[in-house]
Each structure stands twice: as structure tokens, then as C-alpha cells.
Amino acid sequence: MSFTFTKSDGSSILFAVSKNFEHIRGFKNAIDCFKGKIEFLSFDKVDPTKHDYYLVAEDERVSDLDIPKGFFERNPEFRHKMLKIAWITQCIEQGKLLPTESFEVELNQDDVNRTHDGFRKRELFTLEDEKILIDHVHKNDINRFGTKVYEELARKYPQHSLESWRQHYKYMKKRLPPVSDSDESNYCQRIIVKPYSSQKDYTQSTHEQTLSSPISKSASVSKSENKALVNNKRYSDSYFYFSKMRRISIDVDYVDEDLNLINAYLSQFGKKRSLNELCALLSRRFSNRHTFSEWRALFMHFFPFINSEGVDPAILSDRETSAMLDETSDNEVADIDDQMIERKYLFSASEPNTVKSTNRLIFSERKAYAADDSIDNTPSKVPIVNSLSDPRTNRPFFYSNPDSMYRSISNPLHLVDSQHLSPLNRKTHFNNPIGQPQFTCLDDHEKTLRETSFRSLDDMSLRKSNSDNIFVKPGEDLEIPLLSDYSDSENISEKSSDDEEAFEKQVTSSYSSPIKVKSQGKSSKGSSGLDVREHEGSDDDAEVFVDRSPESFGATKVAHTSLEGNAASHKKVEENMQQPVTKKQKKYRMVNEEAHTGPTIIIPSDNNEKVTTLPAGHVPSEEKGKFINLAMHELQNEVSILRSSVNHREVDEAIDNILRYTNSTEQQFLEAMESTGGRVRIAIAKLLSKQTS
């Protein structure tokens, strides 16, 4: 045997090993083979006079060892006798005793100071300790984010550690005023509040409120009210600081009740009182919440366009520049209104969006919609009035981006300018900066439906403005030019007259009675969707009746019939609403209506044969999709009302129109809405698909 774990005098080396090695099989036998001795025990059982070394595992932390208090102070040489277990392994592999310097466990100062109870207890900070922080850190205005200043404090004043000094100053900094570089006398005045002491000295030592603008006598704070302000202490600590011109930052602490109070007072007195008067009223009645300057900072932060100049009212109006209330009735009105405001806004959560209403009041007084945008190079904003007005303000929405129209057609209120948002939502709405309109991406299917609706805005406005002239009058003859196979009524030649162009738009609207179209030849081909019924007459002439009634227009696809015949001899189609219907025609209609209970879909044939009328159960999927798209176009106004309107009568009428259109009951519509998660469009499509299936 080449070497042994023995000393120079021949005695065996006694190792003290952590108990973590006790479960390792063969570890004790390996040391015994080389004449060493081993004991498994914790560090607090180590005897420096008896044990030669203490072995620690490679991954074992010194913080897990139970080091007795003051152990290394009494036995400083034992710091070099704590070895890693790799020393035993390397000695056995190399067959000799290796130096221990490279295998010593590194100990920092915290490990040396560690006791079996953990780190030393943190002492409580006294008033003298906080004076030290103010004199050495706060007044000097040095770099307070480093650690050198706190290291110096920990060395001079060892009652607290470096981290304790640093953390306590962070806590104090929230209540300390900023240091004035120009005038040291304007620094701060400390006020010590002694428990169970009289308030006389305390009241005399408080600073007087200084207001930046003059306040009327009715809104001034008296001495008794100032004493009440002092008695309602806002701080629970034993001391706090005041400054003459206290600057409140934007991130001042506030709660939702504070915003409700601001909104309520601004709505009630905004057009009669100035901003300073409002702040004085709030600070007098709710002195335990905020001071005058804090209320003013909250007003300026959440309502940046409020009038803060002089004694003018906070909300200026062009037509309404009423004078201040008389001093005799001012206090009485204020007391009555304050009680109402407290009950409605402060102690009740029934009005969560009160700030939004005040924002609309302030922004409505601004000339936001004036034509002042022509100076810059931004795109001009064109108002869209057709069913796109804000029901809350009765004002049209303005768009500078044409793509935003797709979103506004189905839900006009979805495109919200951040100016109309409440202060609570202004910071988080879509995570976008203030003043930029918000948009939402659409999928391909929804965008296709929106595009179809967007193209029909002109027809919607035409039907609304020319409702008196939309139907054909008795005795009036209409001439329709022949249409080709690939044309429709929306693309009539641009060379037509003004009357023809007006009729071109009217042809897409619904009529109260069917149109009788007389053409040459046997056949007439409908473009996939019009309820076209051919009269089986002679071989020379064929009469085709196009059902333009509101029932047929709502239940079938609106398409424009393509008529073919002898174009050389017949170039015009005559149409007469007054021509009586023969008995044979009525009989044909009755038979056709009995044969088809559901909506009638017309499939055009390839050759010049009769138009095939299929029942709803045999509708191809392509024609079925076109029919649903058309239905979405017709029910566009009802969908918009259900999404945005708050008028119960309008909502009821919209639901009734949808039920009549889809030929369904209220229970079926309710089940469709529940199955689609409240999405109106998908629910209507689901009801229509049941009709054609």
C-alpha cells in the first residue's frame, strides 16, 4: 500500500463528514482501508481539538450547515480545514496525500457571521436612524441608486446592515418632498405627531394652504374647516412632512371612488364654478382623502382639456356663460347637491361609467368637429351619416381610413376614438397611445360580408331619402334595356339618361307588386335567385312574372334576370304594373306556392329552356351560400341595432324583423343565439341554413 491517511506521528486522520454521506455504501470502508477514521455528524457537533478535517459534498451549500454562533471567531484556523469530498477521491486515485489548498470550501463574510438561528435579527428604525438617512442621503442629493453611500452608513452606524439602510430609505422616499436647489428655506418642515397629545401645537405648526389662483368667498376654507382638515390625519406613521408648494406627481394614489367624486362634482358644478373652487369644495368635504393640490392634480390628469385659468368655469360653453351663483344660495345648493352626489357616486357602485359621461360633456364643448383640419396634410375626414351615427351624441363618425368602414358597418360603436374613453380605460384600451383610432383585424369570411354591405350603402341611402318615389306609380310605363348574360341591373351602361340611372339604383329595391315582363321567344333565363315564373302560353310570346313583393324580396335571393330573345326584333322590354293578371296566371301562382313551402331558388339552365324551379331541399351549396350572403345584406340594419342600440323599442322591432325574415320563432332564435355564444350574424345564418336544408 503506497499511502495511508495518517499524520506524521503515525496516528490516523480523523474525518468529520456530513450526514449526507452516511447512506453511501462503501464510503466508510474505503477510508478504513487507508487507515483513516471517519465520523458522521453535523457541523454543530464538530470538535476542533479532536477532528482534523470536515468534509463537505460538492453540491452542498454552506448555508445548510448548522454553524454555531461565533464558531469561526473562536476557531479561525478551522476555516482552512473544511474540504470538499473530491480531496479524498483524488488522493486515492493518485496514491498520495495532496495539498488541501485547492480543495478548501470558500466562505464569505456572511457565512462567517451566520449563526444556527440564521442571519442576525433586523433592528427597528428609530427617529434618530431616519435623521441619519435624511442628513446623509436625502439632503445631499447624491446618487441614491448605488451602494457606496449605504456601505458607508453600515460602517459608521453598524446597528443596521447595508440592505436595511437602503430598503428603509426607499420606504421613506415616498413621503419625503423633493429637495429645492434654489431656496433651501423652502425645503420642508417636519411635524411630529405625539399620540394622545393636544392638537393645539400641532395645528399651529401646520403650513397654510397656498392657492395658485384666487377663490371666491363661497368656496374658501375657513379656520374651523382647516382644523378639521388637520384632525383627519392621512398618515398612520408617527411623523410626516409638508411643503409650501407641494408638487403631486401623476402617479398619486387614488381609488375609483375618487374618480367618481371628481366626475360628479365636475358634472354638477363644472359650468358654474372654476377648477379651484371645485378643488376647495372637495378638499373641505373630503379632507381625509386628498389635499387641495392632489385634487387639482387628479382633475388635470384625467381631464386635460378642462379650463384651469382664473375664475372662469371649469367647463366653458359657447352659448352658456352663466355667472357664478349668488353667495346666499351657493352654500345651500352645494350642500344639497353634495349629499346627492355622495349617495349616488361615492357609496354606490351602480354607475361604473360615470367618468365617461363627463368626458363626453367636456369634449362636446370643444370644437372637435370644426373644419380646422384643412391646414395640415392629413387626409380629409368625410362624415358617413347613413346609419353610422353615434346614438349617444347623435353625431356622425369620422373616418380617415377607408378600411375602417368595414368595421363600422356592423358595429358603429366598435371604432372608438380614445378621446371618448373614460380615464380608467384610456391607459389600457388596446394598449395604444391616446388619440389614435383603434381597428380590429377581420377574417376573410367576415370581411367579405362587410364588403357586400359596404357596397350597398348607396342603395340604403336611396331607399331612405326617396321612399315616396321608390314604387312604380299607377299608369306609369317603365322601359328597361335588354341585359346580356353577364350583366346585372347594377352595371347598366353609363351612357343612359338621368332617369335611367335613377331607375338603375331603384331596381335593386323591393316593390309592392310583381313586375310583368313581356319578351319575345319561348325562354327567359333568371340569374340564380329571382322568383321568376314563366307563363306557359303560345310559342310566339312568353310572359315572365318577376315577384318583387317584400315577402319574396326578403325570402329569396335578389338577382337580376338576364333575358334572351331575338335582339334584332325586340330591343326593349315593356313593363306595366297596372296590367291585370289573368285567371290562368293566378292558378299557376297558387299551384307553384303550394308545391314549394320553403323559399324558392331559381337555377338558370345552360340552354334556351324553361327556368327550373327547385324546392329548398335540393338547393346546391353554392346557391345556398349566396342566399345567406344576401340575407346578411338585407338584415344589416337589424344586426347593427342589436349590437349597438340601447333603445328597447328599436331592439324589439329588429328582433321581430329577423323572426319574420327567417320564418322562425322566438324560441328558435334564442336557441341559435345561445349555441353561437351571442353572435347575431352566425345565429341568423344558422336559422337560414335550416330553411334551405
Swiss-Prot record:
CDD domains: rap1_myb-like (cd11655), Sp_RAP1_RCT (cd11670). One of its GO terms (molecular function) is telomeric DNA binding. It is found in: Nucleus; Chromosome, Telomere. Its main location: nucleus. Residues 14-105 form the BRCT domain. InterPro entries: BRCT_dom, Homeodomain-like_sf, Rap1_C_Sp, Rap1_DNA-bd, TE2IP/Rap1, TERF2IP_Myb. Involved in the regulation of telomere length, clustering and has a specific role in telomere position effect (TPE). Unlike yeast, exhibits no effect in transcription regulation. Interacts with bqt4 and taz1. Unlike yeast does not interact with rif1. This is DNA-binding protein rap1. It comes from Schizosaccharomyces pombe (strain 972 / ATCC 24843). The gene is rap1.
